[in-house]
Design a protein with these regions (language model features):
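Catalytic cores of secreted/periplasmic lytic hydrolases that degrade extracellular macromolecules
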Residues: 2-152, 156-273
Length: 273
């Protein structure tokens, strides 16, 4: 086995060792609520852990100058966004190395097969697929999300970081959970529904969960297909293209997409990209 592949395997072992420290399983109880809100079932649903540490998020409402507030908001989020995308790039390198193995007709070692099995679970790739087909599907799922898209979604979903969900629980992305006391009970929750707005331990946990949700939930297969098509055409992965795959993120559908595109145009100069 090439030295490069050995290095990538070791790297992924380290990454996967912590992968299940974050729990992202979809709850079946999301079905009713997803239908009521007009979004894909469970599209914004994640599991989070009950124990929440002391929270320290900048109070963005203190900014009187709108431009300064926007710049501060982006500056706060961007380093963690870049860090999580770097982790995805490293994981993707291993998947691409696996794809090269399968294209050459080489069998995986026991260790390599074990890592593939872990990735199947992490990214919800079906056991019925052959190793070659599973790797092909992972190539679609293990990839970055452009920072520009993450930043405008965070701004849109959290009111530029001023919502109580962002301030008290690092939830900048409007993600839900369904375990009792896993988050905040919405003030306007419909009778008979049980969802809560998720709390996260820290910004890293929140961004990681958001990215994981986009990369494996069936509702965002259109986003992953757009991204894959750009990769196949040797094009840059762009926020403007991928945003078209987010119609299931909000009950507002196309109107939500148009709003995000408008936010990109107006705010790109403030992002520091």
């Amino acid at each position: 086995m090439p030295n490069k592949f050995i290095f990538l395997l070791i790297l992924l072992v380290c990454m996967l060792a912590g992968a299940f420290y974050f729990s992202f399983e979809q709850s079946p109880s999301s079905n009713q609520e997803g239908a009521e809100l007009g979004i894909a079932q469970g599209a914004k649903e994640v599991d989070v852990e009950d124990e929440i540490n002391d929270i320290l998020v900048p109070d963005f409402s203190n900014y009187k100058n709108v431009v300064k507030k926007k710049k501060a908001f982006f500056k706060y989020l961007l380093p963690e966004i870049r860090r999580q995308n770097d982790l995805l790039r490293a994981e993707r390198k291993l998947v691409l190395a696996m794809a090269e193995q399968t294209s050459q007709g080489n069998d995986f070692t026991g260790a390599e097969q074990g890592l593939l099995d872990e990735l199947r679970i992490k990214y919800r790739v079906g056991e019925e697929l052959s190793s070659k087909d599973a790797v092909a599907e992972l190539i679609k799922r293990v990839d970055i999300i452009p920072p520009e898209l993450i930043l405008v979604q965070a701004a849109n979903e959290s009111g530029w970081g001023t919502s109580r969900f962002a301030q008290k629980g690092y939830n900048f992305f409007g993600l839900w959970c369904f375990k009792k006391d896993c988050g905040f009970v919405p003030r306007r929750r419909n009778t008979g529904t049980v969802h809560e707005v998720a709390k996260f331990r820290d910004l890293s946990h929140a961004v990681k969960t958001y990215l994981h949700n986009l990369n494996r939930h069936y509702a965002y297969a259109p986003l992953r297909d757009i991204r894959y098509q750009q990769r196949q055409a040797n094009q840059a992965v762009t926020a403007k293209a991928l945003v078209q795959g987010l119609k299931s993120y909000s009950e507002r559908g196309t109107e939500y997409i148009d709003e995000l595109l408008s936010m990109m145009r107006v705010n790109k100069k403030h992002m520091g990209l």
